[in-house]
């Protein structure tokens, strides 16, 4: 059965055991208090993307033993903790390591979290070329992924349907002022005619991945395409002007001229 702790103890839980000790002879010194503390901590980075689990053992306000999931074992902080460290590493180490998942991760996922942590923002994806396009010349494709939340995201490059792993680099996650993130993922490549490059983005806010394509083409083909688009735009403009002028010319009143103009 998975070990569970209340949600209020996710970041810090303190169990204080008061052990009262009195002298063995009657009428001796007044009773003395000895305080033993056990403090477990769960540290989260970007949700559950990275979790660190730390437990501290304290005797009379002095830490003597610690477990840190980044270290992976119990370590004595003072000489007092050395026997306990050896014993716990033999008897409880695997169970304590598992508590990173059974305690920290489990409670994070099961506990009601603030609205800001439940927020989902879908990324915007745009592909651009770092330099003017030229076939058979080294270049860099940039996949700009912006305005997404939470931070967990996976961006991959494909060429003609095959994933590219060589020549891929990425910036660190960049925080925006509205809590969203952005990242740039670059692909060093040499474009050749007919090749199709795809930026593939996976994110918790998406039901299915976003894929944006970029196709390599020659300058002449690009010029013809731009000329065709320009011709279509001009055609639409002139057609609109013609219809407007025709409509205006038909709006005037019809009928006989005014009587004063008759000879």
Curated annotation (Swiss-Prot):
Species assigned in the record: Mus musculus
The entry sums up its family as follows: Belongs to the MHC class II family.
Transmembrane stretches in the record are 225-245
Q: Which GO terms describe its molecular function?
A: MHC class II protein complex binding; peptide antigen binding
Q: What is this protein called?
A: H-2 class II histocompatibility antigen, A-U beta chain
Q: Identify the residues that the record assigns to the Ig-like C1-type domain, covering every copy.
A: 123-211
What is the residue range of the signal peptide feature?
A: 1-27
Q: Where is this region: Connecting peptide?
A: 215-224
One Pfam family recorded for the sequence: C1-set
Task: Tell me where on the tree of life, at the top rank, the source sits.
Answer: Eukaryota
List all disulphide bridges recorded for this chain. Answer: 42-104, 143-199
- UniProt topological domain (Extracellular) ranges: 28-224
Where does the record place the region Beta-1? 28-120
Nucleotide-binding among the record's keywords? no
One GO term under biological process is: adaptive immune response
Per UniProt, which keywords does this protein have?
Adaptive immunity, Disulfide bond, Glycoprotein, Immunity, Membrane, MHC II, Signal, Transmembrane, Transmembrane helix
